[in-house]
Amino acid sequence: MPNNVLIKYGTRQTLTITGVASLASDTNRLAGIETSVIDNTTDGFDDFIFSGKFKVASSGLTDKRQIEVWAVAWDGSGWPDVFDGTNSAETITSVDIKNAICFSLVTMATNNTGDRVYHFSGRSARAAFLGGLPSKFVLFVTHDTNAAFSATAGDHEISYYGVYPQIQS
């Protein structure tokens, strides 16, 4: 009989999000960047914990807007709508489809302060997917700040690590 269960943490990984630098604002928050795939078929982690940052433009911003990061699951045979499991620009077909296939990882309220870096941390993929974790998924980044993100690639990052239980005897 086990004495206790410890939580173990995998190695921190950085997602490929080429194209998020200079990402244009989209009023409907349907256009954005799909990340590279997070594939859990080999490691079998119980959860993934995400952190990240995005830097807005120096000017032209509108108050009371937002940056969104969504999780999108592979269904075992394919990707929904425009998603394909590769780091690429995507425009979701409609708000209704977005609401049906995307799960909110984080929504960051923004203001009109230029050159501000918006951080998020400790966001659980399992919680975003309402308690179930798909074998593969991508993240989708979109915003409606009224100005493109900073053009410097290093101003933006999404990283994660896997989490799994270890039974001690």
Segments from the language model and where they lie:
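Intrinsic disorder/low-complexity detector
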Residues: 5, 28-30, 41-42, 49, ...
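C-terminal interaction-tip segments
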Residues: 1-21, 132-136, 142-169
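Exposed regions on extracellular, virion, or secretory-pathway luminal proteins
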Residues: 2, 61, 75-78, 86-94, ...
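Extended, solvent-exposed segments with strong compositional bias
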Residues: 92-130
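Internal, hydrophobic beta-strand segments that form the core of beta-sheet-rich folds
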Residues: 46-55, 65-74, 129-156
